Amino acid sequence: MIHVGLLSKEKCCGCTACYSICTRGAISMKRDEQGFSYPEIDENLCTQCGLCVRTCPSLSPKFYKSIKCFGAKHINKQEQLSSTSGGFAAALSDYVISKGGVVYGVALDDVKYVRTVRINSRADLPKLKGSKYVQTDPCETFRQAGADLKYGLFVAYFGTSCNIDGLRHYLLCKNISTSNLVTIDLICHGVPSPQIFEDYIDYLSKRKPVNNFYFRTKAKGWGFGSKTFSPSVCYSDGENVCDKPITLAYQQLFFSNNCLRPHCYECPYAQMGRAADFTIADFWGISIFHPQYFDKDGVSLVLINSNNALNIFNNLQNIDSFETTTEIAYFKQENQRRPSQKNSAYEQFWKDYHQKGIEYILQPVSYTHLRAHETGRNLV
């Protein structure tokens, strides 16, 4: 293969490692008709050096075995409550900043754009809080993280497994030391289309301007899977709409498995081998195996996949934790064993989206083509 432009869409995870490594500027990331970004090669600039192929994680994914597993929660109740799970990510991020380091994580930009950003102060860490069920745009962060590491900074990078593996491949190809790097991936269901989410926020904004959208809140507490996700939209006039059909609609799209990136249905990272130093998730099943540690305000599952991660974990002062087993950790984590499966209505879903728009595809409960009036549900 002479360049990554020849990869099928099912093989491309959109991590931007190829774009970041190309010194000729021959690669740009362009959205397709589903709203996912893929590398586009300028043949006039490409020298067929092969760097983009060498840095592509999909062609040679790397995995690490978990060496320890923990349940954890932040000792500060407000930090725990404002986090999606137990607040471990917040505790780790604060630790890195306290050491003079920088944190790369996913934030909402102007409500509807999901991007990976660089944070170097405690005051800005709240931007990274909360799940974002959309594929992020890494922007220039691989290059920025590489520059920070070369400068000697302590760097933490949060992302999906494919994103993290792409970063590691990029740094390896650039011969940049990763001794000051700690990576954190997620047990990932799959990444939905950014275009779908942007259209969804535009749809919500027809009612009145949207100030913020929360993919998950703890309005119903935590611990019982998606039934307690309680997504919420905050409008500019202060109105907060939570757990209503209009806010649940995007969550239902996400779990329908119709709007995930094609690569997600064949994801090589949906397995017990991990791509990062830490893997974090909700500790689903804690009430079954560790009822004494259950907390309705959230508990994080933390997989330790390297000695680097174990050393950092042992130095964290702002968490309460308990050790568990891999069997318990994986019990309620289906995507730790297999990728999400493509919905049988997938082709019809995209046809309807392109022909009829976002409002039409938001109506079904699980995309069985039942309209809202047929299910007895109304969006507003």
Located regions from the model:
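Flanking helices and flexible, charged tails adjoining ferredoxin-like Fe-S electron-transfer domains
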Residues: M1-I2, N44-Y151, E327-I361
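Short, intrinsically disordered, charge-biased short linear motifs at domain edges
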Residues: M1-K9, E40-E43, I246-F255
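Iron-sulfur cluster-binding cysteine motifs and their immediate structural context
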Residues: K9-K11, A17-E40, L51-I67, D277-F278
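Phosphate- and divalent-cation-binding pockets in alpha/beta enzyme and binding domains
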Residues: I21, G166-L167, N378
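Gly/Ser/Thr-rich loops at beta-strand to alpha-helix junctions
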Residues: T84-G87, D110, Y157-L167, G190-P192
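A short alpha->loop->secondary-structure connector
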Residues: C173-D185
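Catalytic cores of enzyme domains
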Residues: I184-Q348
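Conserved small/polar residues in nucleotide/adenosyl-binding loops
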Residues: T368-G376
